[in-house]
Regions:
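Short, small-residue-biased leader/transition segments that mark boundaries at the very start
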Residues: 1-14
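Active-site beta-loop-alpha junctions enriched in small/polar residues
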Residues: 10, 38-42, 75-77, 102-106, ...
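Active-site-adjacent beta->alpha loops and helix N-cap segments on the catalytic face
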Residues: 15-25, 42-48, 78-91, 153-161, ...
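Helix C-cap/helix->beta junction micro-motif
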Residues: 28-30, 93
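Hydrophobic faces of well-ordered beta-strands that scaffold small-molecule active sites
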Residues: 33-35, 72-74, 97-101, 144-150, ...
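Conserved anion-binding
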Residues: 41-146
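A C-terminal functional module that forms or caps the active site or interfaces directly
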Residues: 152-199, 203-207
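C-terminal helical cap(s) of enzyme catalytic domains, especially alpha/beta-barrels
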Residues: 185-191, 206-242
Length: 243
């Protein structure tokens, strides 16, 4: 379950309360919760972000979760100085991060596709850095706590990055409302059909509109669309596993 921080609320106290309540509710239902905050900073400021979103805070001698998400989207443009504080929390609290690598928006190529002196693109180099940052945070299934955001709207690059980043779990936006489909996301998965989370926000939240229903039918429509999405993607993963 991904929570887009910018849409939770504009008033800080209301937003923070809503974020805490939403995360707590989702986790009570057994969901893995990702906060889409795209945080980036360095030093003590990033330590504060990391602690707030993923770690524990001491209050009157008691250690409590601030927000308590399982993972956080982050911007790696500040380099290792911005990732180290997050990696520390990932290690101590069994949490994860997803670094922006090749994003789904139309103008992402203005910077991310630029070629470096090594003849690799900026997004390829960022992906390589994710692999390096995750070397000491490897899980039992071969994936590290440092994941990558790679968009479904660029299926060719998505497939290339899956091959180049064998230990990096992908968060894949762009499915649904942004135009990505099951055939576009299938290459995000490894040979076992693992290694990726496919995200659809508006496609599920606004499914009642597409289905010609009313706001009162929001939950029914959202469930129906989520199940349709699941079946469609699983069908494509099956094709991969069968050759």
């Amino acid at each position: 379950y991904e929570i887009r921080l910018s849409l939770v609320g504009s008033e800080m106290c209301i937003r923070d309360r809503a974020l805490c309540d939403t995360i707590a509710y989702a986790k009570s239902k057994g969901m893995f919760v990702i906060t889409d905050g795209k945080r980036n900073d360095i030093g003590t400021t990033m330590e504060a972000y990391a602690t707030a979103h993923l770690g524990h805070t001491d209050v009157a001698g008691e250690s409590i979760d601030a927000f308590g998400a399982d993972a956080l989207t982050v911007n790696g443009y500040l380099g290792t100085d911005g990732i180290k504080p997050l990696a520390k929390i990932c290690d101590s609290d069994d949490k994860g991060i997803f670094v922006l690598v090749k994003t789904s928006n139309p103008s992402s190529g203005e910077l991310q596709d630029m070629k470096l002196e090594t003849n690799e693109s900026v997004y390829e180099h960022m992906g390589k850095m994710c692999e390096g940052w995750g070397e000491d945070l490897m899980g039992k299934h071969g994936y590290s706590a440092v994941g990558a955001v790679v968009g479904a709207t660029y299926p060719e690059q998505l497939g290339e990055m899956r091959t180049k980043l064998p230990h990096t779990f992908f968060l894949v936006p762009g499915y649904g409302a942004q135009g990505g489909g099951a055939d576009d996301v299938k290459n995000a998965f490894d040979e076992n059909g693992l290694g990726a989370i496919i995200n659809s926000s508006r496609g599920i939240m606004c499914a009642w509109k597409k289905q010609g229903l009313t706001e009162d039918d929001f939950a029914v429509a959202a469930r129906k669309e989520a199940e349709r999405m699941r079946d469609e993607i699983v069908g494509c993963i099956g094709k991969i596993k069968l050759g």
